[in-house]
Amino acid sequence: MEYILENKSILLLSGVLALIFVFIKDRWVSNQSVGNEKMATIANNISDGAMSFLKAEYTMLSFFVIIVGGLLTYLGYLGEATSTSHSLLGFSFLIGAICSGLAGFIGMKVATKANVRTTNAAQNSLGEALSIAFSGGAVMGLGVVGLGMLGLTGLYLFYESTFTAWSLAQRLEVLTGFSFGASSIALFARVGGGIYTKAADVGADLVGKVEAGIPEDHPLNPATIADNVGDNVGDVAGMGADLFESYVGAIIGSMVLGWALFNSIDAVMLPLYIACLLYTSDAADEYRGVDLGG
């Protein structure tokens, strides 16, 4: 046990393994059949719409991240002389925002792939459809925790090895910028995606059902595509960033509590090891439960 606590590189390795697992699952989902040409066309339209929204949203968010990151860097620099703050607070914020955005992007990509493949597989058997659906969910879940573990552990080890004169409190204070960055992206992704989702949903209902008398989700209603794009934007990309923010925030909060109660490096690192143990066991269960051979 003492060896494990002293070798923090195990945490980095677990994050890398989680992302390798994500890649394997993503490739497996991609290799499943999309069905006939009409199904592929509709799926491509939904995917193009979802990715276009994500591109526009992330483009606007990049300006926000740069401005706030620069402001935090400046404020951290001003506080170096009088507190445990540091100009690298802005760097932690930037890394957290990037990881949060990646979590949403990974979820969006695999969701738009898994949707049509699950539908096609359901024509053959419920088991095949569930296998694809669960694999798509595993990509999202393991992507969130893998990025969170890599980001948090990587930053902590970087600060610990580079700034050896820092106290434990200063490392944790600078590390909180990572959670702030993740929360900022989650806020805009969740709210922005939710607004688009509801606008598309209400618009499709009003125009289709009320004005034209077309049933909801009917193929003749062109707004159905926008409605499905909205479902992916709000319930996948927004949810992914939101989960990432909650995951990271819970770990950092536990690390701060460990420092406040025990002022010990072991108490600070314990939440990371617990998170590592939980998600690696879940990944092992998922790997055993799905036949990767299709």
Which stretches of residues belong to each language-model region?
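Juxtamembrane helix-loop transition segments at the membrane interface in multi-pass membrane proteins
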Residues: 26-43, 105-127, 189-223, 288
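Conserved small/polar residues in nucleotide/adenosyl-binding loops
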Residues: 46, 279-286
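Loop-to-transmembrane-helix entry motif
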Residues: 49-61, 125, 129, 133-141, ...
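Transmembrane alpha-helix boundary signature
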Residues: 73-82, 106-113, 149-161
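Helix-coil boundary and interhelical linker segments in multi-pass alpha-helical membrane proteins
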Residues: 78-85, 157-170, 256-270
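Mid-bilayer segments of alpha-helical transmembrane spans in multi-pass integral membrane proteins
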Residues: 97-105, 141, 145, 149, ...
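Hydrophobic, small-residue-rich alpha-helical packing segments that form membrane-like cores
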Residues: 169-181
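Helix-loop-helix junctions within the multi-pass membrane cores of secondary transporters/permeases
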Residues: 216-270, 274-278
